[in-house]
């Protein structure tokens, strides 16, 4: 069977050209950290798929003696900020930590480092951040506040200076974004068998 036409308003998360925000980066923070990008309507791909979770970020050893949970790099972004790192550092999963817990300031700092790096390297028109860890409602606003400080005046663009709430956003589809994006990719592959 090949009938896979999707219904509903899912294009906001999977069709960046429809929003006029191409290039776009999507970062997901859950049991791991993954990321992808669209440039000219095409998924970024090189030697392998992007491994945004394994970028190196400054480890705040003075505030955070946790060595990191990544089996490859220890304290890469994923090793410091994914769900297993939250649980390893604080002794309980993120969904059991209250909004005022110090975990969220540290988490926001690490994720803001990553977002600032992504902005410096790819200069996307929008960054979407989702995943289970971002279900903590105080986290995304903290990340936004820290990104400009991490950039330290280097990127002086109205998207960051004047409308960062529209530049760094949660997925419009919430936790359904990943599965609907996978359906959209499958549908595109079926419509263009050369990509199979």
Q: Residues of each region from the PLM?
A:
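Extracytoplasmic/secreted proteins and extracellular or luminal domains
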Residues: 7-8, 48, 120
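ATP-binding/phosphotransfer module of carbohydrate and carboxylate kinases, centering on a glycine-rich
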Residues: 17-25, 59-196
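Short beta-strand scaffold segments in enzyme catalytic cores
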Residues: 33-38
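A short, polar/charged loop-to-alpha-helix boundary motif
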Residues: 48-63
